[in-house]
């Protein structure tokens, strides 16, 4: 689910996204893991920007075809995910994939409408684009969703390779949420859930696993930079 939307707050002329090399580069990940996240984020950024362009054109002509723009975003997300090199590892079941895409489409549309109505004049950091339909927002969503998908893929891969435990690792700076600091260093069985604030997650940004409550707790998921180390 595009959990970034529920936590989508911005100040006028303040950049919300972070350049991919910086966003992923500072995480406790291998160079290969960082490269995969950046590659997927670039693809997803185009997907969300196409959606914003369609949305904006609908507003310009005074007719926003909800069904059409949702169908296009759905198609683009399926295409991006299914053509990824990691496609087979993003989700454990087809049902998980379908739910993730449906939730992402519905939440992206809902939040865009809601924010445009509430704050129609909010600009992006360049002062030239309406933030809610901007490249900045597309990048912000893309970097978050890429991290969500690759975290899931790495969890599934770790299980397949026989890892038995996992350790939650926070980013370690003064921006880390208190609830994430509290779970930092916790080592649990690979199939167990971390309790992070109100959220129950298998790994950082888990919004798709069967018993996860991450999708209902955007304050624990949005822009999370934590990682997990898998051990045997």
Predicted feature descriptions by range:
Residues 136-232:
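Acidic, glycine-rich two-metal-ion catalytic cores of nucleic acid-processing enzymes
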Residues 1-157, 161-162, 213-216, 229-232:
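N-terminal leader/targeting and assembly helices and adjacent pre-domain segments
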